Amino acid sequence: IIPMLYAYYHQFDLHPETIIRGKGNRSGAFFIFWEQSFERLSGEGIGKNSPDYFFFFHTFLWVFLPWTIVGLIAYWKKARALVMSKFKYNPKSEILTLGGITFIFIIISFAQFKLPHYLNIVIPLFAVLTAAFLYDAYEEGKQRKMKILLGFQYFILSIIFIASVMICFFVFKNDNFYSYLWKGALLILIGYYCLKSEDYFFKIITIGALSSVLLNAVLNTHFYPSLLEYQGGSEMAKTIQKNNIATDNIYKISLNYSWALDFYNQEPVKITTVNALEGKKNIWVYANDKDLKELKQSGFDWNKQFTEKQFRITRLQSRFLNPNTRKQVVNKMHLVHID
């Protein structure tokens, strides 16, 4: 935690003159430990982005894959047992895990500014709760219960398999022969363990682990690399590096965010105006279609232009995932050289 506090000390305490969200003279430690947390709850300063009180519930459904169904059953069983006991103290029963999950879920669900990663704090608690539930079921030796849980795991595996096929053959069609080899080998391995005779408890664990491996392998080796091709900023950064363009000589004439380009260039794009550009020579302008039109109407011309596809990849939608309608929502970002 020391590097984080050191960074916030440099950003806030050493620059009291800096106005951040309408306030100056801020303490970095106070901001990260107190202010920003309560600002997210109230929406003050940071803004409001979701009135959906069930946002984290339906987010949890995919975040906790492939243990989602088992995890929800574990929570329900634990909560039901606590209610049925009328909350009486039981030295053999642990309630901190259940209480932690419930308390945090309630707090973050009422936050006015919500992001999926808020769930990170409850995932370990859910993992402990789920593992304890599975172990207790195994110790009880109730084969029928274990068989039902295994059925749920097979259901999750089938959903992940269908999603993987759709990703590889429809959303972003894969033409790499070598990619088919390892995917085929993984499917053979999964098939082997599905058919292998094994105790229900161990099979639940095995199927869950293989589901996780399949999902993450497809996402990290195919889906996300393909998706990043539509993040104009990161792709343009590759072009900038390839053509040895000076990153301190790049400007933009709008207030549109350029976080990806800033990050991969390791330098923020300078903000300017069309009028201010008139006195500059040998510069590059990072622009969208609207900005290019404005430059053209203002009498600017350029001798070099690089163009990349642009889509806000953190806001996926069906029209983008469907290759037949993708062009309708994909924009373009340009880098032009004004001599």
Predicted feature locations:
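A cytosolic-side transmembrane-helix exit/cap motif
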Residues: A137-I148, D199-F202, Y224-G232
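Transmembrane alpha-helical segments
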Residues: L157-N176, L186-E198, I204-L227
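Transmembrane-lumen/periplasm boundary regions of multi-pass, lipid-linked membrane glycan transferases
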Residues: I1-P91, T97-H117, V122-D136, G141, ...
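Hydrophobic core segments of alpha-helical transmembrane domains in multi-pass membrane proteins
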Residues: N120-L125, S179-I188
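Transmembrane helix-loop-helix
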Residues: N174-L181, F300
